[in-house]
Amino acid sequence: MRKLFLDAFGEKKLDKPPVWIMRQAGRYLPEYRAVRAKFDNFMDMCRNADACCEVALHPLQRYDLDAAIVFSDILTIPEAMGMDLKFIKGTGPVFSEPIQSQKDLDKLKSIEDSIGSLDYVYNAVKTTSSAINVPLIGFTGSPWTLAAYMIEGSGSKQFNKLRKMMYANPQLMHSLLQRLADITIIYLLEQVKAGASSVMIFDTWGGILPLEHYKNFSLKYMEYIAKNVKQKINIPIVFFTKGGSNFFEEIKDKSCDGVGVDWSVTLKQARHRIGVGKVLQGNFDPAFLYGSKQSIRETVRANIEFIQSDKLNNYIVNLGHGIYPDIDPDSVRVMIDAIREFSA
């Protein structure tokens, strides 16, 4: 197995950084769209281990990447807890009966029953890990991010229902977050048992919170998960809070091994605020792939020059969030080739 990705979490400074891409198995690839067309709905595809493996392999077959990520969705846990999940074209994920009260919370399945409904994810991990020669990344949504969808019923611009519960009924909010955290620990451990070499916690909506509430309602539960997972098996764990650059000083002392960085700050700024010891992952603006070949190469060169100038810390080159569906696959090749060229 090529271990450059895992080596980034070691103490030795690497000669070149590993690279992978958030949502690297996705709609920007025509081969992905061909597989997706075979299924009536997205979750049916996620439940098919062979399909998950096939689409996870697509980017590895096209590009020189150092890691794969299991093909799944962050909302598998809420669905396993008994919530009715549908993916609606033009809207995205929708829960028909959002969590609004303690009564709604009481309707959810137990942790044991919920975990038993997620075997299809572990099967996808096992099938994919046996088919690749690079590390496989397992993942989950943070409890706060899962709760955001469970309470709102869908994505939102302002998350008023979510934030209302946080302020008006914090006890209920913490009850939901704790249950999600307890399930997530088992969920990640099962992914590791099935073949994941590291795990990532996507805190997509943590960035909407004020600092103190981020600490109490998001970071607290990510840290709880990381500590409990590491008590069982010491694997690399990456925290990624989208829009979370204001929280780096809080994250730097937590149990994660790496921190995802979006494009709102430079890697130099992120390193200054996080300090030494954590791997930084990121942080290209996904939209930079709309640019010309020359502009892509220039942007890559600047980041690689900084990475190589830091003699103490390792970096994982990635986008600052998921790749956009309408990105030209050839632009991704330009990016990766430039990363390899300027890292040589």
Swiss-Prot record:
User: In which pathway is this protein known to take part?
Assistant: Porphyrin-containing compound metabolism; protoporphyrin-IX biosynthesis; coproporphyrinogen-III from 5-aminolevulinate: step 4/4
Q: Which cysteines are joined by disulfide bonds?
A: none
Write the record's keywords in alphabetical order, separated by commas: Cytoplasm, Decarboxylase, Lyase, Porphyrin biosynthesis
Q: Which family does it belong to?
A: Belongs to the uroporphyrinogen decarboxylase family.
Catalytic activity annotation: uroporphyrinogen III + 4 H(+) = coproporphyrinogen III + 4 CO2
A GO MF annotation of the entry reads: uroporphyrinogen decarboxylase activity
Q: Which organism is it from?
A: Francisella tularensis subsp. tularensis (strain SCHU S4 / Schu 4)
Domain of life, source organism: Bacteria
State where the protein is found: Cytoplasm
**What processes does the entry annotate via GO biological process terms?**
protoporphyrinogen IX biosynthetic process
What this protein is reported to do is described as: Catalyzes the decarboxylation of four acetate groups of uroporphyrinogen-III to yield coproporphyrinogen-III.
What is this protein called in UniProt? Uroporphyrinogen decarboxylase
Q: Which InterPro entries match?
A: UROD/MetE-like_sf (IPR038071), Uroporphyrinogen_deCO2ase_HemE (IPR006361), Uroporphyrinogen_deCOase (IPR000257)
Quaternary organization: Homodimer.
Which Gene3D superfamilies does the protein's record reference?
A: 3.20.20.210
Task: List residues binding substrate.
Answer: 23-27, 73, 149, 204, 321
Site residues (Transition state stabilizer), renumbered to this chain: 73
> Which Enzyme Commission numbers does its entry carry?
4.1.1.37
Report the principal subcellular site. Answer: cytoplasm
Top EC class, one word: lyase
